[in-house]
UniProtKB/Swiss-Prot annotation:
Keyword Ribosomal protein: yes
Lineage: Bacteria, Bacillati, Bacillota, Bacillota incertae sedis, Caldicellulosiruptorales
Protein's UniProt name: Small ribosomal subunit protein uS2
NCBIfam families (alphabetical): rpsB_bact
Entry's Gene Ontology molecular function annotations: structural constituent of ribosome
GO CC entries: cytosolic small ribosomal subunit
Gene3D superfamilies, alphabetized: Glucose-6-phosphate isomerase like protein, domain 1, Helix hairpin bin
Similarity comment: family membership: Belongs to the universal ribosomal protein uS2 family.
UniProt entry keywords in alphabetical sequence: Ribonucleoprotein, Ribosomal protein
Annotated organism of origin: Caldicellulosiruptor bescii (strain ATCC BAA-1888 / DSM 6725 / KCTC 15123 / Z-1320) (Anaerocellum thermophilum)
Region described as Disordered: 229-257
Superkingdom, natural source: Bacteria
Biological processes annotated in GO: translation
SUPFAM superfamilies hit by this protein: Ribosomal protein S2
């Protein structure tokens, strides 16, 4: 029983890839067809790859592994934060700071500074300092919170990265690969799948598509940590055939626009 059905993927627009002129040839195996200059992703491949990614995340989290959710593009920022918090994991949704993985010791010093400023605000220290100094400290705190708030309680370097758009998050991919950290990612038709350990072929630009896939990764985390059972999707062979027809219809609709 698949984690996501073809119908769910279609409704969220997961099948829409990028314009053909912006493709990466290595994604050819995940492409169903092309219509009006836009690639249509093979959702049967997405269903299979989603299942593999889900099982990997679930099994690793059950062993105590940490997942870092990464997505800094506007379409992903809110979802990355919401889903990481929902499953009790960590996230980066503003800007990837260089060395976040490869120089984590330095990043930790900035996190400690953030926590120090938070303590100062909570224990009344700000109230006895000059107003001008307090304003500067508050600005520093807000800046650190913006970029590091999602990892301020992360105890160590993550064991897994979940990424929305590895092409945009190039630095995160490079650091993870350098350290041998496995990557699970939504990979659109303009990305290089060879850099990703668990490829989920799909639209990384549509908010609904990003939300659908990311929420399932969060579900895998929760199931791995707490043993919660999420109702899996069921897809019959008839549904697969029908969904394939709908993909072709959707592709034809592009021609007509």
């Amino acid at each position: 029983m698949p984690v996501l059905t073809m119908k769910q993927l279609l409704e969220a627009g997961v099948h829409f890839g990028h314009q053909t002129r912006r493709w990466n040839p290595k994604m050819a195996e995940y492409i169903f067809t092309e219509r009006n200059g836009i690639y249509i992703i093979d959702l049967q491949k997405t269903v299979k790859k989603m299942d593999e990614a889900y099982e990997f995340v679930k099994s690793q989290v059950a062993e105590g592994k940490i997942v870092l959710f990464v997505g800094t593009k506007k379409q992903a920022q809110e979802t990355i934060k919401e889903e990481a918090e929902r499953c009790g994991m960590f996230y980066i949704n503003q800007r990837w700071l260089g060395g976040l993985l490869t120089n984590f010791r330095t990043i930790k010093t900035r996190i400690e500074r953030l926590k120090e400023l938070q303590r100062m605000e909570e224990d009344g220290t700000f109230e006895v300092l000059p107003k001008k100094e307090v304003n500067l400290l508050r600005k520093e705190k807000e800046r650190l919170l913006k970029y590091l708030g999602g990892i301020q309680n992360m105890p160590r370097i993550p064991d897994i990265l979940y990424i929305v758009d590895p092409r945009k998050e190039r630095n995160a991919v490079l650091e993870a690969r350098k350290l041998g950290i496995p990557i699970v990612a939504i990979v659109d038709t303009n990305c290089d799948p060879d850099e990703i350990d668990y490829v989920i072929p799909g639209n990384d630009d549509a908010i609904r598509a990003v939300k659908l896939i990311t929420s399932k990764i969060a579900d895998a985390v929760i199931e791995g940590r707490e043993g919660e059972q999420f109702t899996p999707a069921t897809t019959s062979s008839q549904e697969v055939d029908k969904a394939s027809e709908q993909v072709e219809i959707a592709a034809d609709d592009i021609d007509e626009e």
